[in-house]
Amino acid sequence: MKLTEEQVAQYKKDGFLIIRNFNTTEEIDIVRGEMKKLIDELDTPSTISIFTTSEQERKVDDYFLGSGDKIRYFFEKGSIEDGKLIVPKDMAFNKVGHALHDLNPKFEEFSYSQKIHDLIYSLGIYNKALSGIMYIFKNQKIGGEVDIHQDSTFLHTTPLTTHAIWFAFEDSTIENGCLRGLPGSHTEGITRRFITDPNSESGCSFIKLAEDKQYNKSDFVALECKKGDIILLDGSVVHYSEPNTSPNSRHAYTLHFIEGDNGVIYENDNWLQSAKPFRVL
């Protein structure tokens, strides 16, 4: 599915673009069913890694840092108490990452589809490499807030070439914590990077590139989606999501891609690394 000239212009203006009915219900149900199977078959791991974007609570462990070329499971903060699950297992996870697209055949077929190739190609990115793939649960009642951020802070290239496709696997509404984006914010660059840091107790740290900006949440646009819609996101666009306190989950899938050629450098101090080069779509 190729973007029209009008869609490309809108994306370049806002830094995000909603595309309706990109995936069929059947396509989504296949990979959602596969994720259910993976969760059902998973023994509760001895390593419990809780994922949060709160800088006050962010903890980076070896399990997380080693997930770039593996399938690993990260728990929601509100699902664990004294090292034990306090919610049903299928509601306990924040996300699964970061190599589903390469290690699971169902997700591989979904992620490397021709229509995704055509979509990215129409942006003028011809040699695209996939990285940082996540299945996001945002489960009912306990789905955590995702703080205001820019994806290129975490997946940095020189020059900046990171983009993301956010797939709505369920309806995404204001009530269950839809994405919210700040139009035009991608034109101002990024203010910091998240890097591996052997001198940091956690193994990672932020480095400042420019003065942090103060944002008013009322300036952000709610990017509500129906199941099957996608959101295209520039890696520099500022976005976030509220916690999900509703009775409805908000499953989604995020696929990041970068320019894989033309002298573009994927920084070797990015937190997400793979033993093999990122596979080109």
Swiss-Prot record:
2-oxoglutarate binds at residues 95, 134, 149-151, 166, 241, 250. The keyword Cytoplasm does not apply. Its cofactor is Fe cation. Its EC number is 1.-.-.-. Fe cation binds at residues 149, 151, 239. SUPFAM superfamilies: Clavaminate synthase-like. GO terms for molecular function: dioxygenase activity; metal ion binding. Keywords: Dioxygenase, Iron, Metal-binding, Oxidoreductase. It holds the Pfam family PhyH. The keyword Glycoprotein does not apply. InterPro entries: Phytyl_CoA_dOase-like (IPR008775). Has alpha-ketoglutarate-dependent dioxygenase activity. Does not show detectable activity towards fatty acid CoA thioesters. Is not expected to be active with phytanoyl CoA. PANTHER family: PHYTANOYL-COA DIOXYGENASE DOMAIN CONTAINING 1, PHYTANOYL-COA DIOXYGENASE DOMAIN-CONTAINING PROTEIN 1. Belongs to the PhyH family. PHYHD1 subfamily. This is Phytanoyl-CoA dioxygenase domain-containing protein 1 homolog. It comes from Dictyostelium discoideum (Social amoeba). The gene is phyhd1.
